[in-house]
Amino acid sequence: MSSNSWADVSESERAPSGGGWGYSRPSRTNYVPPHLRSRTPSSEFVAPSPGNNDRGGYGGANSGYGGRGQGYGGRGSGYGGRGGPVGGWNARSGGWDRRDTETNPFGNDGNADPAVNEQENTVINFEAYEDIPIETSGDNVPPPVNTFAEIDLGEALNLNIQRCKYVKPTPVQRNAIPILAAGRDLMACAQTGSGKTAAFCFPIISGIMKDQHIERPRGVRGVYPLAVILSPTRELACQIHDEARKFSYQTGVKVVVAYGGTPVNQQIRELERGVDILVATPGRLNDLLERGRVSLQMVRFLALDEADRMLDMGFEPQIRKIVQQMDMPPPGVRQTMLFSATFPREIQRLASDFLSNYIFLAVGRVGSSTDLIVQRVEFVHDSDKRSHLMDLLHAQRENGNQGKQALTLVFVETKKGADSLENWLCINGFPATTIHGDRSQQEREVALRSFKTGRTPILVATDVAARGLDIPHVAHVVNFDLPNDIDDYVHRIGRTGRAGNSGLATAFFNDNNTTMAKPLAELMQEANQEVPDWLTRYASRASFGGGKNRRSGGRFGGRDFRRESFSRGGGGADYYGGGGGYGGVPGGGYGAMPGGYGPVPGGGYGNVPGGGYAPYGRGGGAYYGPGGYGTVPNQGYGPGVASAWD
């Protein structure tokens, strides 16, 4: 899939829509943040198509995520919020009182152990995880755990874990939670649907709970979150927020979400009620920062979900502004965690700017060595794609439960193509809906809800839905238009076969997709899938390195680029400079002179000889001194790390 849909997402996020929030105000010129004033407007809105779909009215009675009535605690708090008493971590005597009136995210049954909505709670097939390979690299990696009880997460959080019906940790949770609980920075590469959200939410919530007496500035206009979680899309931000609210229930930790496409004043009012964890999209967070409504100076935890997409598809300037140019504490002072299903080497190099002495964790893909996701590739000319899709849907309906259509996700390249295909499907008796960048936030939320409930069991989507969204029970993913990048293909088919359950992925291939032939054939071979002979012939004709095949790491979505960098050493194997290492001088590191990452010979990561990570001298030669990343000078990557494989 081309990058158009992600640009569309960004543009759509910048154009707030006021409908459905029960909020109106006198007409006036909209505030446009300075960093967006030079942008060109988004493409014209595509008129909604008729048919049997979700595009009726929107019951906009809700006041947004977080809901009313979630008062932030007793009087006398330091937030000075408008419209009533607030509380929080500034005033411990009042902040915890909000637990008495906190909305129950598990339901309204009032039981000590409320049940999670069964439709949303996908049953995890833990047996499928038993043989998944795991790789860790870095200094002094904490050992994995086998149960949540092995880590002191706190009584209230442990109770919520039980309420969520989490029996035991998934592989990414077994390894990531102890790493983060130890205060280490982390870059984690794990398949979507493998439990990444809980893997970073649990340590964040636990860390805030354990430091209950932190004082934040009083009587100021802005708010001071202790944790920031960034995601590339509104849907993923809302999903993370909903999950984090479940995990933080009755802990005293307040979670708020902020994203574009909705009135900013509604979200400002929610922030003024208090916030400990802020889940946000980069564009809306930059807007709030420029308005002076949010300060990052108290941030102790920074998490980036789908980090590779944010850094690779145009969000990098916004991320760098948030992390490096505002008042956020530097790496080493704050704890940073990056998660995604894929981490190509070039994205790792960008991401490493935000981390300090980090650990790299790679969890093998579920389905790479099993048949959990059955992948099929069929040669279909563009003119025949619709009729071929119709044949698939008819066969799927006949084989379905009591004639019901199984949930099917169809990926297309353009927004207009999505609307056109949706209209055609509805006309031909297949209820469908769409999600793409030109639909308002309300329409996108309604479309997702309609799809999840089975009212419209076919969702036609651009790549806006490909990243991170947890849509349970998707039986079939159809790549109507193949993407141009194999990593995007991996994220797309990851919408099915989630949580260790089985699924089907079908791709339509033709002469327009020849650059994908080689990486697609390699991926299918890796996953023990049957590769058609005609695809093998296309792959053999493909030139070496053709297309945008950025994958590395075999069964993993990526491997630690530092291993390759430091193991190659020199002799023309460098990346930036000739004759060794990453520098432009023989034997050099990342810097301009011999011996390390810094600009001084023998320099480690900092700018002091034998130095550390940045000007703080962190490491002092023990970690980043002469010779590489090892714990002993001149020893390369250092001693072997104990295996974390199951």
Swiss-Prot record:
Disordered: region residues: 1-64, 76-117
EC category name: hydrolase
Positions of short motif DEAD box: 305-308
Gene Ontology molecular functions: ATP binding; ATP hydrolysis activity; mRNA binding; RNA helicase activity
Reaction(s) the record says it catalyses: ATP + H2O = ADP + phosphate + H(+)
EC number, UniProt record: 3.6.4.13
PANTHER family: ATP-DEPENDENT RNA HELICASE DBP3
Identification of the protein by name: DEAD-box ATP-dependent RNA helicase 52
Gene: RH52
